[in-house]
From Swiss-Prot:
Keyword Mitochondrion assigned: no
Region (Disordered): 107-148
Upper taxonomic lineage: Bacteria, Bacillati, Actinomycetota, Actinomycetes, Frankiales
Keywords carried by this UniProt record: Ribonucleoprotein, Ribosomal protein
A cellular component term, taken from the record's GO annotations: cytoplasm
BP GO terms, sorted: translation
Source organism per UniProt: Frankia alni (strain DSM 45986 / CECT 9034 / ACN14a)
Name of the protein this chain belongs to: Small ribosomal subunit protein bS16
Stored SUPFAM superfamilies: Ribosomal protein S16 (SSF54565)
Pfam families, alphabetized: Ribosomal_S16
GO MF, one example: structural constituent of ribosome
Composition-biased stretches (Low complexity): 129-148
Family, per entry: Belongs to the bacterial ribosomal protein bS16 family.
Length: 148
């Protein structure tokens, strides 16, 4: 029986994700599969590629032929080079870890609490604050008798 390693499409319109599967060469794209050996999510940045390397090596060794898209994925993960005894590919780009939402919220809360203690930033509010705090103190802009 001729087997192929191919992509089985899942997801909705304009949001595809794929399973990397081993199936009989005569089956349809989304038909019956023998074994699922990985996943591929092209829309995420960087795209997510998960391949069970041990199972991929097994199926390649028993003669399963990868389709062109799967061959490209296997080259990126290094499974094809391992099968063909070629040098390993350069390392893949790894997604940055996401920041913890709780820490972001707490930092924003601390910043908001610190904003209440700051002095007024607009001139009108600054004059009101100055007149309320120093009602008997002369204003800096007011002319004095000694200064003329």
């Amino acid at each position: 029986m001729a087997t192929k390693i191919k992509l089985q499409r899942l997801g909705k319109m304009r949001e595809p994700h794929y399973r990397i599967v081993v199936a009989d060469a005569r089956t349809k794209r989304d038909g019956r599969v023998i074994e699922a050996i990985g996943q591929y999510h092209p829309k995420s940045d960087p795209s997510i590629i998960k391949v069970d390397a041990e199972r991929a090596q097994h199926w390649l060794s028993v003669g399963a032929q990868p389709t062109e898209p799967v061959l490209a994925i296997l080259k990126v993960t290094g499974d094809w080079q391992k099968f063909k005894n070629l040098p390993a590919p350069p390392p893949m780009k790894v997604a940055e870890p996401k920041a913890d939402k709780r820490e972001i919220f707490q930092a924003a809360a601390r910043a908001a609490a610190g904003a209440e203690d700051r002095p007024a930033t607009t001139p009108k509010k600054a004059k009101k604050a100055a007149s309320a705090d120093g009602a008997d103190a002369p204003a800096a802009d007011a002319p004095t008798a000694a200064g003329q």
